[in-house]
Amino acid sequence: MLRAIACESQGARHGLIDDEVTLDFDNRHRRRLAMRGKDGLEFLLDLPRAHRLRQGDTLLLEDGRRVRVMAAKEELAEITTTSAVDLVRVAWHLGNRHLPVMLLPDRILIRRDHVIEDMVRLLGASVAMVEAAFDPEDGAYAGGGHHHHHHGDDHDHG
């Protein structure tokens, strides 16, 4: 089976796109996964390690073709508050629980979770159900984006 062996970040625009895959959040963080593009191109995602694919990234196939990654619409909870301070407070509580969040200028999007939705309501926030692409923050320890360089582990722990 044809393999996707590398990924270019959304900012890198090199060459034409041959097909497109639309994936939900869970399926955009994989190492190996059989895929089928919207135009029928079948291939195996076969990366050296699990990698978080972002909206607009491009998968590079071993035969030189390129497949654009799109984020699928998902059921999300949209959190809003009446002030920026309250929104920051809610963001702090969500971060304290290590939840994936999508930060926008005036709202926060999270995956549906009735327990968390109740918690943010108790903090004074409003919660609405929306359907949107979910592309959350990487987090402080996620590393430098799409840098695929490995230094090895050849030092002595002795």
Positions of PLM-derived features:
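Glycine- and charge-enriched low-complexity intrinsically disordered segments
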Residues: 1-17, 84-123
